[in-house]
C-alpha cells in the first residue's frame, strides 16, 4: 500500500451503476460491455482494475475519459463530468498500445504533447529534460520513436502522460514489453507519484504488479465487478498461519512438530525461503552496471521529475474538489457529488 492519504481523501473517480450497451445499426442492443459498475477511487490511491480480455475494462476507461457515453449510471472525474474540458487538463493517460508518430524523435514527441497542453517553451524544455532523465531515454532522445523497442515506447508514452503534471493518471498495461529492470523502475515511479498525492488507476494483466502497488483492487468479468477490496481483504487465507524464524535445527523442528500435534495441528510444511527471480535478475543487472558494462537500450531511470514533486499540493490547488474529506467508507460511493452533477 503506497497511498499518501487515508480513505477519507477527496474522491477523484466515482461511478454508480454505470452500464454501457452497444447497439447495431437499427439501434437494437447487441452487447452489454459494462453492467452496473459501481466504484470509488480516492485521492492518492493506486486502484487496480483487473479482468480477462473482454471483461469491460477498456470500455470503462473510455467512459471515464469521456470518449464513450454510458447508457445508464453516473460518473464523476475530479468532481466534474468526464466530458468537462478543463478537467481533461488534469488527467494523464497511457493507452494499452503506444500510439506515437513514428518519425518524431523522443524529444519532439514530448514537445508536441507539451504544446497541446499550451505549456510555454521554457516549461516544455525543462519538463522534457526531467522526464527523459526520469524514464532513462536521455541517450536516445534524438532517435525517431519508430526505431524504439516496445519497452522504450512504453517509457516515452509514460513520460508523455506526465508532461501536464496530472492529478489523475490512468495507466493501461504500463509495463507491457519492458524487461524486469524497466518494470521495477516504473512500479517504483508509480508508488512515488501516489505518495506525492497523485491518483492512479492501473490496468494490468501482470497480477504481481497490481499486488505490489494497489491500495484497492476490482476484478471484472462479463462487464461486472465480481470482487472489490484491498489486497489484504481479498487475499488473506484465514484457515492457515505462517510462523517465521531463523534457521531451525532438525531437533527443534521435531519438538515444534510434537507440540503442534498435541493440539491436533499438523505441521504441513518446513522449508527454507526462496528469493524471487525478479530480485535475482535485478541484482545481476545492478552488479553489471557497477562494473561499467554498457547497453544500447534505455538506461537506468533517474529521479522523479521535479515538477511532479508538488503533485499533492499543486494539483489540489487547481483541481476541483471531488468530495468531502470524510465522506463515507472506502467501499461506499459518495452519491451526493454525482447527484449534484445530475442536477446541473
Regions found by a protein language model. Name each.
Residues 2-15, 21-36:
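A short, flexible loop at the N-terminus of ABC-type nucleotide-binding domains that lies
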Residues 73-87:
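Conserved ABC transporter NBD signature motif
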Residues 111, 115, 123-140:
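Conserved ABC ATPase "signature" region
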Residues 165:
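Conserved catalytic motifs of ABC-family nucleotide-binding domains
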Residues 169-173:
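Catalytic Walker B motif of ABC-type/P-loop ATPase nucleotide-binding domains
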Amino acid at each position: 500500500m503506497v497511498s499518501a492519504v487515508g480513505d477519507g481523501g477527496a474522491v477523484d473517480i466515482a461511478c454508480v451503476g454505470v452500464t454501457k450497451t452497444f447497439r447495431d445499426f437499427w439501434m437494437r442492443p447487441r452487447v452489454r460491455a459494462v453492467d452496473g459498475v459501481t466504484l470509488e477511487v480516492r485521492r492518492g490511491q493506486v486502484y487496480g482494475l483487473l479482468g480477462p480480455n473482454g471483461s469491460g475494462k477498456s470500455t470503462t476507461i473510455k467512459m471515464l475519459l469521456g470518449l464513450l457515453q454510458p447508457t445508464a449510471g453516473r460518473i464523476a472525474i475530479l468532481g466534474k463530468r468526464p466530458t468537462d474540458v478543463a478537467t481533461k487538463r488534469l488527467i494523464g493517460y497511457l493507452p494499452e498500445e503506444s500510439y506515437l508518430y513514428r518519425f518524431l524523435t523522443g524529444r519532439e514527441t514530448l514537445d508536441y504533447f507539451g504544446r497541446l497542453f499550451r505549456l510555454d517553451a521554457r516549461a516544455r524544455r525543462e519538463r522534457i529534460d526531467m522526464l527523459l532523465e526520469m524514464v532513462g531515454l536521455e541517450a536516445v532522445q534524438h532517435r525517431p520513436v519508430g526505431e524504439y523497442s516496445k519497452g522504450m515506447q512504453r517509457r516515452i508514452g509514460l513520460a508523455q502522460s506526465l508532461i501536464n503534471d496530472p492529478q489523475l493518471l490512468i495507466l493501461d498495461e504500463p509495463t507491457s514489453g519492458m524487461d524486469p529492470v524497466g518494470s521495477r523502475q516504473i512500479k517504483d515511479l508509480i508508488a512515488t507519484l501516489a505518495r506525492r498525492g497523485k491518483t492512479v488507476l492501473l490496468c494490468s494483466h501482470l497480477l504481481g504488479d497490481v499486488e505490489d502497488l494497489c491500495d484497492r483492487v476490482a476484478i471484472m468479468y462479463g462487464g461486472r465487478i465480481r470482487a472489490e477490496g484491498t489486497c489484504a481483504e481479498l487475499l488473506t487465507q484465514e484457515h492457515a498461519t505462517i510462523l517465521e524464524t531463523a534457521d531451525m535445527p532438525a531437533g527443534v523442528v521435531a519438538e515444534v512438530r510434537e507440540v503442534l500435534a498435541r493440539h491436533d495441528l499438523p505441521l504441513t510444511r518446513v522449508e527454507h525461503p526462496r528469493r524471487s527471480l525478479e530480485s535475482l535478475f535485478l541484482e545481476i543487472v545492478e552488479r553489471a552496471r557497477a562494473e561499467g558494462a554498457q547497453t544500447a537500450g534505455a538506461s537506468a531511470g533517474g529521479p522523479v521529475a521535479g515538477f511532479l514533486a508538488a503533485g499533492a499540493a499543486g494539483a489540489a490547488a487547481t483541481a476541483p474538489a471531488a468530495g468531502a474529506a470524510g465522506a463515507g467508507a472506502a467501499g461506499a460511493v459518495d452519491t451526493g457529488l454525482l447527484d449534484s452533477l445530475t442536477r446541473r
